Swiss-Prot record:
Xref: PROSITE patterns: RIBOSOMAL_S9
NCBIfam families registered for this protein in UniProt: PRK00132.1 (NF001099)
Record organism: Bradyrhizobium sp. (strain ORS 278)
Name of the protein this chain belongs to: Small ribosomal subunit protein uS9
GO CC entries: cytosolic small ribosomal subunit
Keywords: Ribonucleoprotein, Ribosomal protein
InterPro entries linked to this entry: Ribosomal_Su5_D2-typ_SF (IPR020568), Ribosomal_uS9 (IPR000754), Ribosomal_uS9_bac/plastid (IPR023035), Ribosomal_uS9_CS (IPR020574), Ribsml_uS5_D2-typ_fold_subgr (IPR014721)
Family: Belongs to the universal ribosomal protein uS9 family.
GO molecular function: RNA binding; structural constituent of ribosome
SUPFAM superfamilies membership: Ribosomal protein S5 domain 2-like
Example GO biological process: translation
Amino acid sequence: MAESIQSLDQLSQLKGAVTAPDAPKYEKKVDKFGRAYATGKRKDAVARVWIKPGSGKVTVNTRDIEVYFARPVLRMMIEQPMVVAARKGQYDVICTVAGGGLSGQAGAVRHGLSKALTNFEPELRSVLKKGGFLTRDSRVVERKKYGKAKARRSFQFSKR
């Protein structure tokens, strides 16, 4: 093949003829019960999320979402991936979440729900990725240092 190329023009023509590899194809991942599963994490919280086609009922640790997450902001945060993907009310969501506080748990459920949606409908991946729902939020609490009152706050200083 190298012998057949005589000039740079022929090389550029050959380069154009070679096709670029296609984007990776994502498959639908569903268990025998027709549910998609994913794990989401945020701070110290870990959420295990299952989704299946249904009426839009969201259950967190065997309790309704309104009972478990009383603050409307947290509920809105969890429902964001469904709203962005235009799938609100089409899937039943069952999740178990442990560790951390309510804000971290809501973030973990949101992350897991986004991943489960992409497992159920791979074509939603680009929409959710663009919205930043598939990216793990890696921010965690900064550790306390010795010689300091907290992570960065110093002890009170007295000149005299």
